[in-house]
């Protein structure tokens, strides 16, 4: 990858595809590809790669902490996500090429280039997904690398100066340092330039990425590209972040033969709430999930659910 402190770096990755998984030679068949970006306390997860390979994709997961196999530091690895100095404090001195974000974004784009160079990968069908800090990166990379055809950041969003979870880093910055972070490293700067379909996935009571800032981030994405999936009770973690079937279904709609997600086309509120939607499939059931709790923090906010009348044929609820 790109130089760090004047020296070349290498990045460890796991790669697999349906042929490798089945222990057979590559033939003429080309597969859709996916780049996988882990979050904090994570690494290049082999099982994540194998999960996507089992679902028909050529998948690559890269380590974003300068580590190699068995999570051991590489002698020529880049900065570590666990190092607050690399993640936050480079914004203080303005040396962005030493920041973790710069190196992680570069590594993700180069991993995509590697994927595209493989004869078994369909260059017109590559996707991107990341979890937590990897979701943060996905928001940035999707805006910078227009070779991707779809992206799905999980948890990660912009306006990190408003998210209390990240006070541990943001509070160390001066006013100028924080302004520099928000100008150069915050996803809110990049999301308006996303030019591919993007599915934003989060839980309603996430401990790090709050719903209000998530909503603001989603609205920065051009309307015809953005989809959002807020899952009730979704916990924060790597397994929880790669488990949602909505991600694969979304990618299938972008690079395969799948149906597009349900899209709400109109909302009216008087004595009742009425939602109109458009979809290529008939939903099995529907519920209205809401909160009027304005006092609790995001993780402890109380949500309620109420049923209604679903008309599959007319596309109303």
Annotate each PLM feature:
Residues 221-238:
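Catalytic histidine neighborhood in serine/cysteine hydrolases
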Residues 1-29:
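N-terminal cap/lid segment of alpha/beta-hydrolase-fold proteins
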Residues 55, 109-179:
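Primarily recognizes the serine-hydrolase "nucleophile elbow" in alpha/beta-hydrolase
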Residues 44-46, 50-106, 158-169:
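Cap/lid segment of the alpha/beta-hydrolase catalytic domain
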